[in-house]
């Protein structure tokens, strides 16, 4: 989890720096939270598909709502500030990529390696 969080935080920060280089006031953690949700959803696909689908669908719906209702949406009212939905999107994408890489790495590690007897 910690390594995934670090990679997600770097992904969000670098993406915002590249995509929105005029944004100098963002201090949130929400992009990382979306990234962790996407990461957990992806890595759970193999052993808990129902849970994974639920997490991914609801995360996707919230991302859609945030991107459509920019400015004075419900999330902005809750936190008393503008919502930087781009951080949510980049966090979720980064988290999903990290999850896919973890699944691929786990799949490669779980393959049976030939022994000396083979």
Task: Outline where the language-model segments fall.
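Hydrophobic alpha-helical transmembrane segments of polytopic
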Residues: 5, 51, 55-58, 91-98
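Membrane-interface helix-boundary motifs at transmembrane edges
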Residues: 1, 43-51
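Transmembrane alpha-helical segments
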Residues: 37-42, 94-98
């Amino acid at each position: 989890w910690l390594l995934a969080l670090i990679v997600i935080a770097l992904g969000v920060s670098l993406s915002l720096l590249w995509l929105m280089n005029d944004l100098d006031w963002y201090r949130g953690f929400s992009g990382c939270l979306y990234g962790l949700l996407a990461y957990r959803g992806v890595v759970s696909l193999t052993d808990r598909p129902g849970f994974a689908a639920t997490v991914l669908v609801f995360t996707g719906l919230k991302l859609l709502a945030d991107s459509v209702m920019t400015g004075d949406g419900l999330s902005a009212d809750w936190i008393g500030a503008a919502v930087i939905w781009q951080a949510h999107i980049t966090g979720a994408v980064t988290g999903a990529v990290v999850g896919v890489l973890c699944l691929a790495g786990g799949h490669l590690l779980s393959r049976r390696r030939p022994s000396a007897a083979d």
